[in-house]
Amino acid sequence: MALLQISEPGMSAAPHRHRLAAGIDLGTTNSLVATVRSGSAACLPDAEGRVTLPSVVRYLENGGIEVGKTALSAQKTDPLNTVSSAKRLIGRTLADLHQNTHYLPYRFGDNQRVIELHTRQGVKTPVEVSAEILKTLKSRAEETLGGDLVGVVITVPAYFDDAQRQATKDAARLAGLNVLRLLNEPTAAAIAYGLDNASEGTFVVYDLGGGTFDVSVLQLTKGLFEVKATGGNSALGGDDFDHRLFCRLLEQNGLSQLNEQDSQLLLSLVRAAKEQLTTQTEARIQATLSDGMAIDTSISRAEFHNLTQHLVMKTLEPVTQALKDAGVGKNEVKGVIMVGGSTRMLHVQQAVATFFGQTPLNNLNPDEVVALGAAIQANVLAGNKTDGEWLLLDVTPLSLGLETYGGLAEKIIPRNSTIPTARAQDFTTFKDGQTAMTIHVVQGERELVADCRSLAKFTLRGIPPMAAGAARIRVTFQIDADGLLSVSAQEQSTGVQAQIEVKPSYGLDDDTITQMLKDSMSNAAEDMAARARAEAVVEAESLTDAVNAALELDSDLLDAEELQQIRQGIADLQGRLKDGKAEDIRAAAAKLGSITDNFAAKRMNRNIQRALTGQSVDNI
């Protein structure tokens, strides 16, 4: 029998044939697909020469589906069946949207776990809507390239959580795409700029898209792309600038509630006005509503800037934090890469230039740069030969860990750890005879579980009954290249194991995303004090349990005075547990330990005597 051949890792099975792969920027407002041909990355146009595909899907009465510009043109007249900005909804719940549903012209379902949109073709989810966009891009790529795609790299905001990332992969699967990797959008931009310009040094990627904001601090050196720190807000983007203009328009015209058609009409007009103000000093908004009311309003560039300046400043908060996390000063940044169509707004460019004291880089189209980087990555992962070797190191934005006794958060994978990664740590039981252990996986920077985000729980059963602290349970955290987490727990003596893939049914809400890191910094001293107290409580409870168990077995070794002293020591310690500080609890525990020293010695002697009873000198 002939031996099977195995190719070298990374090599194509057919080394002389270019394998077709593509990079997809699945955007809030527009989506693009790009590929590498003749060693150069380029976005693929549609039949009319347009590279951008509006991220809009319309469900028709005849059962058909429109995607892109045709659907966009019907948004004003058929808003309930025309879905845009699905990226803002994917992997989220109604609760995550807070009060902002009133300006979204959709009929939402009552499902609390998954957002549902009622259309004439029935209930549709953001995953299904996104899948239609991906199908269109897949068809465009395969028709242009003349063959089937072996795989794609799809970009996502760096601050997308597990639910949003998994939902994106589900959409790709529905579209019939093989996902080679999910790639953070700022990282994709760095790939495009790094390879095109052969730059080295520290760069900041400022990515303001239609629905999300991301910032990454990257170190680019020859052959190495390393993400030093990330930050951002998954619910801040160009749509929010539109929303501010929309609300101002309602205020100026004394409007409160609009029907879906009028809402969609005005939203499209304020979006057009926003884009006009990039090149003009004034924009005019004219419309006739369904009730016959006429609207004719002008807004100046200065008014628009004043109205939305707080949103621009809001983007600089994660920028400041990311620089701090990376240990980099503004003066050390070699360049600022602008990504996303929303960075075309002049006051955004001005704010970034003022903050860094330099003109941002914009020699690549900000709408295309993410797709270009994804295409380069897809080309490498497909096994196609490249002119030069390079390595991409991505990071996880928040720490991951688990709950230990006393409500403490034990970090297993610290934030800004390079991914993919796997880390393990041994834990033990707290109670004698404990045969099960609940593994509570959390995310965040705070010291107490109550202040972190709960991701998942699972139970390891079948632990052999042993004395407290004797069992050894190894817990392993593993994050794949897409940023998805799996956790396993294994009891070392028996090999009994349990595991879980963390796929939460909801996303982080807006406040949580932006506040988690700031809270960890501002509450650092209080958190450490709370952790110290919690640790002292755990140690004290363990001590009192051990002493009480010993008294049940061997209290006859003590006279009345000794027994009273120990019971008083236990009472004093338990009294400190209610409201005492960490140092007070530890002092009371030390006192109880001292009181029980003689008791421990007597117990040791008794156990030795029992062990020696009936033994000959020779046996000993």
Swiss-Prot record:
| Pfam annotation, one family | HSP70
Q: Which SUPFAM superfamilies is this protein grouped with? A: Actin-like ATPase domain (SSF53067), Heat shock protein 70kD (HSP70), C-terminal subdomain (SSF100934), Heat shock protein 70kD (HSP70), peptide-binding domain (SSF100920)
Q: Does the keyword Transmembrane apply?
A: no
Annotated Gene Ontology cellular components are: cytosol
Q: Which Gene3D superfamilies match?
A: 1.20.1270.10, 3.30.420.40, Actin, Chain A, domain 4, Substrate Binding Domain Of DNAk, Chain A, domain 1
Question: CDD domains, from UniProt?
Answer: ASKHA_NBD_HSP70_HscA (cd10236)
Which keywords label this protein? Answer: ATP-binding, Chaperone, Nucleotide-binding
A GO biological-process term: iron-sulfur cluster assembly
Looking at the record's lineage, which domain of life comes first?
Answer: Bacteria
Q: Family, per the entry?
A: Belongs to the heat shock protein 70 family.
Q: What does this protein do?
A: Chaperone involved in the maturation of iron-sulfur cluster-containing proteins. Has a low intrinsic ATPase activity which is markedly stimulated by HscB.
Q: What is this protein called?
A: Chaperone protein HscA homolog
Q: Which organism is it from?
A: Neisseria meningitidis serogroup B (strain ATCC BAA-335 / MC58)
What are the leading ranks of the lineage?
A: Bacteria, Pseudomonadati, Pseudomonadota, Betaproteobacteria, Neisseriales
